[in-house]
Amino acid sequence: YPELVSAILSEALVAFQHSLNAKVIAAIATNLGAPTAFAGLGAASSDTLEALLIAGANIRQKYRLSLTETLEVVVPYWAKDVLKVDLFRRNGVGTMPTDADVAAIFGAANMSVQYVYDWSELPADSVAWPATLPALIYPAGSFVKLTTDVINLNAVYDAASLAVNTYTGLFFEQGVAVAPMC
């Protein structure tokens, strides 16, 4: 069963990277503090953009940033689809807005959006979008991801294990931290 063992080891590495990604996002969220709730007035796309613009204005005012300073926005991966389907409904045209259309809207607001996995996942078998859309917003360069040397070992054999025909198939570790810069 070498193919099965290889597939499982590969999937273990992917799962490990997802867990690290979740920890990095959680560290950023913790550093940013408690989120501000925004009472929406209507459609998902306009409410989301308005909430982010208000948050962005507050950040620009607090740090006295240029009005054209790029702000980083982190949202769950499914947020793009929420925005696209809402724009489709609002525009009343027969074509679905593209990823570029959504990016252009945020680009016009000087926001660089990252759609991420491993944070605020959709419940299994969802039939409706969540009622709230969490977002992290901060000036570009506010956080640095720190890493240390990585050790990956595979197929490690030792004398005691050889006697009973076992080996270490996979061992990995990674040192990761998030440092706030401002």
Q: Model segments located where?
A:
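Extended, solvent-exposed, turn-rich assembly/linker loops in the middle of proteins
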Residues: 36-107
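Intrinsically disordered or highly flexible coil/loop and linker segments, enriched in small
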Residues: 18-25, 65, 115, 119
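Phenylalanine-focused residue identity feature
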Residues: 16, 38, 88, 106, ...
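Long, contiguous amphipathic alpha-helices that act as assembly "spine/axial" helices in icosahedral shell
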Residues: 1-42, 170
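Alpha-helix capping and helix-coil boundary motifs
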Residues: 4, 44, 94-102, 121-122, ...
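Extended, compositionally biased alpha-helical segments that mediate assembly or anchoring
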Residues: 116-182
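A generic structural motif
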Residues: 101-121
